C-alpha cells in the first residue's frame, strides 16, 4: 500500500469522518489477525482511540489508511502476546464417531468465530471478492498457525498488497527478514493443505436454486433430498464442541440420531459468513422456535462440502442481525 506524500493534514474537526472511512478495512485486518469478530472490533476501537490521540501529529507524509493499518497491526500484535491460538475442531484431533458421548466443549477463546461478509466487504466488487476469499474459515484458521509477526507480514503483503519495505518499517526489521517470513508463512499454509483459489472461482457463490433446495430439504428433514445435496466427503463441526465428523454417512447419522432434535427447524438466510452462505437455525420450542446455530456451509460442485454450526447464538445471532426467537 504505497504512501502518498502531500496527503491532507487532519484536524480534530475533520478526523472522525476520515478515520471512520477506513473502519471496514481495519476490521478485516484485525479479524484475520485475531480470528474473532468481537476481538477484532475491540482492536479497531483501540486503533481509533490511539489514532485520535495522535491525530494532530499526523503530517500527511503517508496515506491515512497506511498510518491506520500500522496502528491496527501493532494493536493486534499487542493483543496476541501470550495468547493461545484460535482453531477449528479439525485442528485439534481426528474425526470421531457420530455419537453423543464424543461431545466435549472447550472455551470460546479456543475457536475461530464467524464474521458477516458485509462487515468487511469493500465498495468495489473486485475488492469484495478478495476480501471474502481472505476471510474464509479455512484461511483464517490456517493464519492462526503462524507466529504473529509472520501472520502480519502475510496479511499485509498478500491480502492488502503492501510492499515488503513498508512491512519491514512497520515491524522494525529488514526487507530480507520480511521476505523470509513470507516464505515460511506460505510453506506453513501449504503444509496445512490450504488451496489458494482464484478470485474468479471464489466469486461464484452457489446458485440460489441450490440453496433453496437445501433450505427446503433441511426444514423438511428429508433424508433422501439431503443425501442428494451433501458431498460424499462432507465434514461437520459444531463449536464449542471439539467433535467433528467426516463423510456424508456420519453427518446424516448424527442428524438422524443424536441430532434428531433439529427435525422441524426453521432456517433463515443471512447472506454470507466468511465468504460462504450462512443461515440462522431455530429449533422447535413451545410456542415457536428458539435459536440453535449459525450454519455456515461451503459448497463444491453444487454439493455441500462442509457444515459448521456455531452454537454460541447469544453472541453470534445479534452479530448477523438474527431475531432472538421465531413465533410459531
For each feature predicted by the language model, list its residue ranges.
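Arg/Lys-rich amphipathic alpha helix in sigma70-family domain 2
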Residues: 73-91, 98-105, 191
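A short, charge-rich alpha-helical start-of-domain segment used by transcription regulators
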Residues: 2-28, 38-41, 52
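Sigma70-family region 2
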Residues: 36, 46-64, 78-87, 144, ...
Amino acid at each position: 500500500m504505497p504512501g502518498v506524500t502531500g496527503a491532507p493534514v487532519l484536524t480534530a474537526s475533520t478526523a472522525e469522518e476520515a478515520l471512520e472511512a477506513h473502519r471496514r478495512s481495519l476490521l478485516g485486518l484485525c479479524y484475520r489477525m485475531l480470528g474473532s469478530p468481537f476481538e477484532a472490533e475491540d482492536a479497531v476501537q483501540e486503533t481509533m482511540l490511539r489514532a485520535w490521540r495522535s491525530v494532530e501529529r499526523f503530517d500527511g507524509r503517508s496515506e491515512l489508511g497506511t498510518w491506520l493499518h500500522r496502528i491496527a497491526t501493532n494493536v493486534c500484535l499487542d493483543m496476541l502476546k501470550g495468547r493461545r491460538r484460535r482453531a477449528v475442531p479439525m485442528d485439534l484431533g481426528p474425526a470421531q464417531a457420530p455419537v453423543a458421548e464424543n461431545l466435549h466443549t472447550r472455551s470460546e477463546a479456543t475457536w475461530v468465530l464467524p464474521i458477516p461478509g458485509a462487515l468487511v466487504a469493500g465498495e468495489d466488487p473486485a475488492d469484495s471478492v478478495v476480501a471474502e476469499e481472505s476471510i474464509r474459515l479455512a484461511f483464517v484458521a490456517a493464519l492462526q498457525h503462524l507466529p504473529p509477526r509472520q501472520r502480519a507480514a502475510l496479511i499485509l503483503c498478500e491480502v492488502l498488497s503492501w510492499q515488503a519495505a513498508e512491512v519491514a518499517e512497520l515491524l522494525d526489521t529488514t526487507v530480507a527478514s520480511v521476505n523470509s517470513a513470507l516464505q515460511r508463512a506460505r510453506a506453513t499454509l501449504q503444509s496445512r493443505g490450504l488451496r489458494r483459489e482464484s478470485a474468479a472461482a471464489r466469486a461464484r457463490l452457489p446458485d440460489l436454486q441450490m440453496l433453496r433446495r437445501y433450505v427446503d430439504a433441511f426444514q423438511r428433514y428429508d433424508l433422501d433430498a439431503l443425501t442428494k445435496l451433501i458431498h460424499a466427503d462432507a465434514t461437520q463441526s459444531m463449536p464449542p464442541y471439539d467433535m467433528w465428523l467426516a463423510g456424508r454417512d456420519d453427518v446424516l447419522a448424527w442428524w438422524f440420531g443424536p441430532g434428531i432434535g433439529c427435525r422441524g427447524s426453521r432456517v433463515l438466510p443471512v447472506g454470507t459468513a466468511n465468504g460462504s452462505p450462512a443461515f440462522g437455525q431455530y429449533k422447535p420450542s413451545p410456542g415457536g422456535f428458539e435459536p440453535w446455530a449459525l450454519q455456515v456451509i461451503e459448497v463444491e460442485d453444487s454439493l455441500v462440502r462442509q457444515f459448521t454450526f456455531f452454537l454460541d447464538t447469544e453472541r453470534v445471532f445479534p452479530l448477523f442481525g438474527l431475531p432472538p426467537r421465531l413465533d410459531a
